[in-house]
Amino acid sequence: MKKPIDQLKPEDAIPLFVKIKKLILGNKKPDGFTRLIFSFSLFAWFMLMSWNSISYFVLLTSDIIEKNKGFSVQEVIIKNGQKLGFNGEEFLASLHGFLFHNLFIWLLIFIGLALMYRKKRIYTLFVFGGLMIHFVYMFFTLGFQYFIEDISFFDKILYFILILGTLIHSFLISKEKETALKNSVSEPNEDSENL
C-alpha cells in the first residue's frame, strides 16, 4: 500500500507519529496527576535539552559564525572562563565536553520521564541519576561558580520543577503502590474469613 512519493501528504506521517508515541509512552494512559507532572517535567526537560543542544551547535559552528558575522563566540567564552578563574582555552575545552556529554545525559533523563508516564517506579533512578551525573559533571569540569553565575534563574527554576515534580510524584506513586499492596493482601484474608 505504498504510495508514490508525489502522492504523499503530510497527514500520511500521522500513523508513524502515533506508533512512535505508543512505543515511547505505552498504550495505557496514566491518571491525571501523572500526566500533569509529566507535562511540567517534559517542558522543563525540553527547555534545558534545547538550550544545551543550541549551545553545543553554536560552539561547533563558532568558526562559521565568526566568518559570516565577524563575531567570535570562542573569544566570548574564553573571557567568561577567565572571569570564572579558568585558563580561557581550558574553559572552552571543558565547556565543549560538558555540552557534548550532556546530550546523552538529557536522553537518559528523557527515558526516565517516559518511564514516569508509564508509572514504573524505576524512573526515579533515571531522572535523579541523570541529574546527579549532570550536576557532578558540571561542578567537576566547570566549577560551582559556573552554576552560580552562568546558569540563568530561569534554568534554575526548570531544574527545580524537574526535581520537585519527580520527588512529589515518586512519593505519591510509592504511597499508591503501598495502598494497592495492602488492599490486595487484605482481600484474601477477608475471603478466608467468609468461608
Per-segment meaning from a language model:
Residues 2-195:
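Topology signature of small-to-medium multi-pass alpha-helical membrane proteins
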